[in-house]
């Protein structure tokens, strides 16, 4: 997007809906990094600043949120089952209580792979992805040498949360279900822009009359986010 009165001011806008499955934090991690790399390529081509919004299906205390907000994450201290900070059976976030998981995401210096849509996805030290057509026998011929592998992942963009920048916290909740009332939606921006104001989520006092959403009054299980920026 470009301002009509000043076409040199460009905003590259992205929106997403990350996988819901709480147990597949590894796929969520891959998704957000591939998405950020795509936006970075667009920025390199067109210039401007990036805004990224959507349903990330990760909570503010999660490892993936930390990666986006701080720019790096040590996967050796994070389990793929807790990367998104969401639990199916409990209405509270337990990620902070699980600092070091029994099964670390990085168990060995070999690239990890998984089958998804008949393709093998190979993870390297910076989560750059090499995708090969589906085969029963993965080919590690071009793998990164073990001495060059690292458990630290760097995020391709330097982003900040618009809500956290103004409120010093995320708005809560952005999703209201019977067994899960939490924040999973965000508007991220680059520092070249200045967030001026944001739209707050409904208060719990106003939501207490409902057991869950959607319902006859609220048509969605997510609440809208809105941020105003100065470019």
Predicted regions and their residues:
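Metal-dependent phosphoester-hydrolase catalytic domains
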Residues: 1-5, 23, 30-33, 37-51, ...
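Active-site-proximal beta-strand elements of phosphoester/diester hydrolases
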Residues: 10-20, 222
């Amino acid at each position: 997007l470009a301002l009509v009165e000043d076409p040199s001011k460009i905003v590259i806008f992205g929106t997403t809906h990350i996988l819901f499955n709480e147990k597949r934090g590894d796929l969520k991690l891959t998704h957000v990094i591939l998405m950020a790399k795509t936006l970075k390529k667009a920025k390199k081509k067109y210039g401007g600043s990036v805004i990224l919004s959507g349903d990330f299906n990760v909570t503010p205390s999660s490892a993936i949120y930390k990666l986006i907000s701080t720019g790096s994450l040590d996967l050796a201290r994070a389990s793929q089952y807790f990367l998104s900070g969401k639990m199916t059976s409990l209405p509270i976030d337990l990620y902070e209580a699980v600092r070091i998981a029994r099964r670390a995401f990085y168990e060995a210096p070999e690239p990890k792979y998984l089958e998804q849509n008949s393709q093998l996805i190979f993870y390297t030290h910076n989560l750059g992805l090499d995708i090969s057509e589906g085969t029963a026998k993965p080919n590690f011929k071009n793998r990164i040498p073990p001495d060059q592998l690292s458990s630290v992942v760097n995020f391709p963009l330097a982003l900040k949360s618009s809500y956290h920048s103004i409120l010093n916290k995320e708005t809560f909740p952005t999703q209201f279900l019977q067994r899960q009332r939490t924040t999973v939606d965000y508007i991220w921006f680059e520092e070249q822009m200045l967030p001026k104001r944001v739209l707050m989520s409904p208060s719990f006092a106003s939501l207490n009359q409902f057991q869950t959403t959607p319902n006859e009054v609220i048509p969605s299980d997510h609440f809208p986010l809105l941020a105003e920026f100065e470019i």
